[in-house]
Design a protein with these regions (language model features):
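A short, surface-exposed beta-strand/turn
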Residues: 61-68, 89-93, 166-181
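An acidic-aromatic
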Residues: 63-125, 189-192
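N-terminal leader/targeting segments and the immediate start of mature chains
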Residues: 17-69, 142, 212-222
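Short, cysteine-centered beta-strand-loop-beta hairpins and adjacent loop/turn segments enriched
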Residues: 51-57, 79-82, 158-164
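Sec-dependent N-terminal signal peptides
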Residues: 4-15
Length: 222
């Protein structure tokens, strides 16, 4: 289960050259990377789902934004029916992390939220970054097209001991090369990530840390 959750955190794909990968596949992947790293700033809505058979183990909505070195990610997750929220960000000077975990029962007292803030010169990589880099871990990639998407299938992992899925399926929009969907099976569970919306053109102020956004939280500066 730990390996499965690590892969979900890693989840999203990535695209660098591999000698055994067809040039048409590499071209689509490289264009996808360029489209998803808009220098004017890009924000994408993503839905993550992890299930075992017909049982939903985890669902997660992520609103992830980036512009150069600036970043922000707002995550709402539901694990076995329990909802939790978090937000991380870097505004060029400070990085912060806010987590909200609900009480597990009516008898449990409400927990006080905390925002941890510290000075930083550059942002740390977050679990929700679109890391666009997994193709090097696979020996084979095939591609087909339908009316709206390029559908790329990665298979035959290079290193089995890393517990990578045997097959990863990636959908990329034909019209603009935005990533649409990533799906796989891992340790008996089905994992999917779907990008539901992409917005470009973000002001720097959008990434600035503002304590007023967390009125009920304790701000702790490290």
């Amino acid at each position: 289960m730990k390996k499965l959750m690590m892969f979900v955190a890693f989840a999203a794909v990535c695209f660098t050259a591999n000698a055994q990968i067809d040039s048409k596949v590499k071209d689509v992947m490289q264009k996808c990377v360029k489209a998803m790293e808009n220098p004017a700033g890009v924000e994408y809505d993503m839905d993550f789902k992890v299930g075992m058979g017909e049982v939903s183990m985890m669902s997660c909505h992520v609103l992830a934004s980036s512009k150069g070195n600036l970043s922000k990610a707002v995550v709402t997750a539901k694990v076995f029916g329990i909802e939790a929220k978090s937000e991380t960000g870097f505004d060029g000077n400070e990085e912060w992390e806010w987590n909200h975990a609900p009480s597990l029962s009516a008898d449990e007292p409400a927990k006080k939220d905390t925002v941890f803030v510290q000075k930083a010169s550059e942002r740390k990589k977050t679990p929700m970054d679109l890391d666009l880099d997994i193709i090097e871990q696979y020996r084979k990639a095939t591609m087909k097209t339908d009316a709206n998407y390029y559908v790329i299938t990665l298979s035959n992992p290079v290193e089995q001991e890393k517990a990578l899925p045997g097959e990863v399926v990636i959908k990329v929009y034909k019209k603009n090369y935005y990533l649409r969907e990533l799906s796989m099976e891992q340790e008996g569970a089905t994992i999917s990530m779907t990008v539901t919306n992409v917005r470009t053109g973000l002001a720097d102020d959008y990434f600035r840390f503002d304590p007023s956004h967390y009125p009920d939280a304790v701000v702790v500066r490290k």
